[in-house]
Amino acid sequence: MKSKKKGKKASESLTIMNELVLPNDTNVFGNLMGGRLMYWMDIAAGIAAGKHCSTPSMTASVDNLSFKNPIKLGNVVHIEAKVCRAFNTSMEIHIKVWGKDLLHEYEYESNEAYFTFVALDPNGKPRSVPALIPETDEEKKLFDGALRRRQLRLILAGKMKPNDATELKALFV
């Protein structure tokens, strides 16, 4: 088992998935259904989490899921997921989604979200995860913002008092 002190690079968790949007994946307007996309995003996030912690994990929350542009029937869904911060037993995974129109040869940003996964031991109990080592400027930016996003999640879940959210308070002082 890897030591939490050493950590793993964010890039080691990068997961890329591609799916073709078929008729069964679409609504009456020919757009990819949001639930199907969320299913694929959850799979990508789970794989990224597994690459980071080398153990099964489960979805704990989904935050800031935005739908910017619909993905049409026949287009390819391109999903990239990467762990952006590791806490004690949980990991925040950033996911970006693009649509690729192969016929007209262009791609467009479609969705973005943050998933939180909790690592599990063989008995299904939370277990510690390795620290995360951000390397690129983007990875460092996501890493720095993850603590604020986590504090907001904990406040909204009633697990943290707003006065204890030091990172969030610093934004307003």
Specify the residue positions occupied by each region the protein language model found.
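HotDog/MaoC-like acyl-thioester-processing domains
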Residues: 2-17, 72-73, 84-173
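Hydrophobic beta-strand-centered segment that forms part of the acyl-chain substrate-binding groove
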Residues: 9-12, 32, 43-80, 84-85, ...
